[in-house]
Amino acid sequence: MRIVIITGLSGSGKSTAVRALEDEGFFCLDNLPVSLVTTFIELVEHSREDIKDVALVMDIRSRDFIKGYDQVFQAIASAGHSVKIFYFDATDEVLIRRFSETRRRHPALEGATVPEGIRFERDQLAGLRRIATAIIDTSEMNVHRLKELVIGLVKGGEGVLEMQVNLQSFGFRYGLPLESDLVMDVRFLPNPYFVATLRPFSGLDQGVREYVMGHKETVVFLEHFRDMLELLLPSYRREGKSYLSVSIGCTGGRHRSVAIAEELYNYFRQRNVNIKITHRDIDKGLG
């Protein structure tokens, strides 16, 4: 029997995932007490119905599960069944918006605000997140995309959506992009702003790009940063992440960060990475 544990943060899409698994023929059960897991498995094994796939939703609502999830997984393994743990996540901003739209209270802490509930839940589930088979960030997903991803995961990875990389340049002067997964500060590179003939232009212009790339430290940095991204991207894909935001920052977001982002974009696009590029602050501070 194949068993999938659906867990993660409240508001992250677990209910949608369960509906997708039900459509695939899974027998789904929500909020099963830990003390009944072994009994439930035995009942399914001896049932007259041919149940081969089971999904159990187990999360913060069951404090016994949070304290003893290792015992749950051990009991399943001892019974000779395979188990996958799908951990659903989203950014705090997205979770807060979802709770606001549905006007629901956060279930983790009675009487707490939604942000307080999210922080508490993240802390309580941190250990479970570390051992998950897949971590699914639903921040940028619609319902259709989430269902397709879940179905792909239970089929052993077949049909899993390709991760999208969103590469953007920005200026630290205007604040960090809140949605960033990775941030690289390139303010250590030579600055075309201090070259009078280059100042009016941007990192999209050939003269600025040649100036930035014409220094040895830029070439060495870019080589190492590309290598790091090539190492990280497959790991994020295996984690189940569908969207990765990489932000490159300089002082004003017009020269160095734009030039470096363009170099990275062209490099990874030639290697068939699903990548998009934006320049958040390129037109700011022009007058």
Swiss-Prot record:
GO terms for molecular function: ATP binding; GTP binding. ATP binds at G8, L9, S10, G11, S12, G13, K14, S15. Belongs to the RapZ-like family. Displays ATPase and GTPase activities. GTP binds at D59, I60, R61, S62. This is Nucleotide-binding protein Gbem_0872. Keywords: ATP-binding, GTP-binding, Nucleotide-binding. InterPro entries: P-loop_NTPase, RapZ-like, RapZ-like_N, RapZ_C. NCBIfam families: PRK05416.1.
